[in-house]
C-alpha cells in the first residue's frame, strides 16, 4: 500500500493571502496568525508572501481565482469573517464565499485554504481569531502549505 503524507515546511513556497476588509478588526488577527504560521512554522520567506485586500468575503473568490490562475503562487489562503445578522444576507455571503473558493481550488489545481470565519456572533469570531479557539488564519496557512507538499508528492 502506498501512503502519501506531507509536512508543512515549504521554504520556497510562494503564497498569496486574500483578505476581506469588512470586519477588519477581526481579520487583522487572522492575517497575523497566517503570516506567523507561514514564516515561523512553514519557513516561507517574507518576500514570497503577497497580501491582497478585497472589500468583503463575497469578493474573495474572484481575487483568489485571479491569483491562482496567475501562475505566480503555489497556494492562496483566503481570510475573512461573516457574522450572522437578522437577515438572510449571512447565508448568501457565507455560501457564496465558501462555494466560490472551493470552485477556484477545483478549477485551478492550486490549493485554496479556507480561513473564512462564519459565526453566530462577534464573540465567536474573536475566539477563533487568536483567543480561546486558536487562530483559524494560522490553521488555514498550515493547510495551504501541507497541500502544496501533498500535491508535489502526488506528482513525483
Curated annotation (Swiss-Prot):
Catalysis: reaction(s): (2S)-2-hydroxy-3-oxobutyl phosphate + 5-amino-6-(D-ribitylamino)uracil = 6,7-dimethyl-8-(1-D-ribityl)lumazine + phosphate + 2 H2O + H(+)
Active site: 89
Gene3D superfamilies: Lumazine/riboflavin synthase (3.40.50.960)
Pathway participation: Cofactor biosynthesis; riboflavin biosynthesis; riboflavin from 2-hydroxy-3-oxobutyl phosphate and 5-amino-6-(D-ribitylamino)uracil: step 1/2
Family matches, as InterPro entries: LS, LS/RS, LS/RS_sf
GO cellular component terms, A-Z: cytosol; riboflavin synthase complex
Annotated binding of (2S)-2-hydroxy-3-oxobutyl phosphate, by residue: 86-87, 128
GO molecular function: 6,7-dimethyl-8-ribityllumazine synthase activity
GO biological process entries: riboflavin biosynthetic process
UniProtKB keywords: Riboflavin biosynthesis, Transferase
EC numbers for this chain: 2.5.1.78
Binding site for 5-amino-6-(D-ribitylamino)uracil: 22, 57-59, 81-83, 114
Highest rank taxon of the organism: Bacteria
PANTHER family membership: 6,7-DIMETHYL-8-RIBITYLLUMAZINE SYNTHASE, 6,7-DIMETHYL-8-RIBITYLLUMAZINE SYNTHASE DMRL SYNTHASE LUMAZINE SYNTHASE
Known partners and oligomeric status: Forms an icosahedral capsid composed of 60 subunits, arranged as a dodecamer of pentamers.
NCBIfam families: lumazine-synth (TIGR00114), PRK00061.1-4 (NF000812)
Family label: Belongs to the DMRL synthase family.
Function: Catalyzes the formation of 6,7-dimethyl-8-ribityllumazine by condensation of 5-amino-6-(D-ribitylamino)uracil with 3,4-dihydroxy-2-butanone 4-phosphate. This is the penultimate step in the biosynthesis of riboflavin.
The protein, known as: 6,7-dimethyl-8-ribityllumazine synthase
Provenance organism: Salmonella heidelberg (strain SL476)
Amino acid at each position: 500500500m502506498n501512503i502519501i503524507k506531507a509536512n508543512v515546511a515549504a521554504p520556497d513556497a510562494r503564497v498569496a493571502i486574500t483578505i476581506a476588509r469588512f470586519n477588519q478588526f477581526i481579520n487583522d488577527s487572522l492575517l497575523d496568525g497566517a503570516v506567523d504560521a507561514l514564516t515561523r512554522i512553514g519557513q516561507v520567506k517574507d518576500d514570497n508572501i503577497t497580501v491582497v485586500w478585497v472589500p468583503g468575503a463575497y469578493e474573495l473568490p474572484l481575487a483568489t481565482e485571479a491569483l491562482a490562475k496567475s501562475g505566480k503562487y503555489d497556494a492562496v489562503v483566503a481570510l475573512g469573517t461573516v457574522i450572522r445578522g437578522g437577515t438572510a444576507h449571512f447565508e448568501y455571503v457565507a455560501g457564496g464565499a465558501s462555494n466560490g473558493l472551493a470552485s477556484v481550488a477545483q478549477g485551478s489545481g492550486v490549493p485554496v485554504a479556507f480561513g473564512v470565519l462564519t459565526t453566530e456572533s462577534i464573540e465567536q469570531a474573536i475566539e477563533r481569531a487568536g483567543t480561546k479557539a486558536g487562530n483559524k488564519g494560522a490553521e488555514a496557512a498550515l493547510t495551504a502549505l501541507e497541500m502544496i507538499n501533498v500535491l508535489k508528492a502526488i506528482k513525483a
